[in-house]
Amino acid sequence: MNEKFSGKVWVLGDDIDTDIIIPTEYLALKTVEDMKPYAFSPLRPELAGQIKPGDIIVAGKNFGCGSSREQAPEVIKALGIKCVIAKSYARIFFRNSINNGLLLIENADLHDEVTEGDTIDVEVNAKITHNGKAYPIASLPDNLVDILNAGGLVKAMRKLNGLD
């Protein structure tokens, strides 16, 4: 996965839990599309309506903490977010995101140096560039790259088993 892209940054803080990403009361809605307007609503009610396809979330530490719910990465992906860059992730959220085809990147420094609305350039498995400064990215293991390239775990397994 050596993809390159640029995107507008939305900055979020530390400990953004799954109840903030998609509150419990909206989990009963029929589709992820129905849930999209309520994403991040406890923190920033207007945010879901402002995000455009290709935008990037830059967050602090422990992004995706709280209860395990597959709808959290699904709704982020449905909003059109290209990737989330955070200082760290809750482990279950990390795997749920990969399994749903949402790219997550860890970087300890970018959050403290980026401003909401900035544009950053991402070279997956290489670096992030912001205002001329490069931030290295650790490579993801090959098995996770394969899942992301397929669009998620179910699609990767279908491909592996010759069903697609």
From Swiss-Prot:
GO terms for biological process: L-leucine biosynthetic process. It catalyses: (2R,3S)-3-isopropylmalate = (2S)-2-isopropylmalate. Gene3D superfamilies: Aconitase, domain 4. One of its GO terms (molecular function) is 3-isopropylmalate dehydratase activity. Its EC number is 4.2.1.33. The keyword Transport does not apply. The keyword Amino-acid biosynthesis applies. Pathway: Amino-acid biosynthesis; L-leucine biosynthesis; L-leucine from 3-methyl-2-oxobutanoate: step 2/4. Keywords: Amino-acid biosynthesis, Branched-chain amino acid biosynthesis, Leucine biosynthesis, Lyase. It comes from the Bacteria. Heterodimer of LeuC and LeuD. PANTHER family: 3-ISOPROPYLMALATE DEHYDRATASE SMALL SUBUNIT 1 (PTHR43345:SF2), 3-ISOPROPYLMALATE DEHYDRATASE SMALL SUBUNIT 2-RELATED-RELATED (PTHR43345). Belongs to the LeuD family. LeuD type 2 subfamily. Catalyzes the isomerization between 2-isopropylmalate and 3-isopropylmalate, via the formation of 2-isopropylmaleate. This is 3-isopropylmalate dehydratase small subunit.
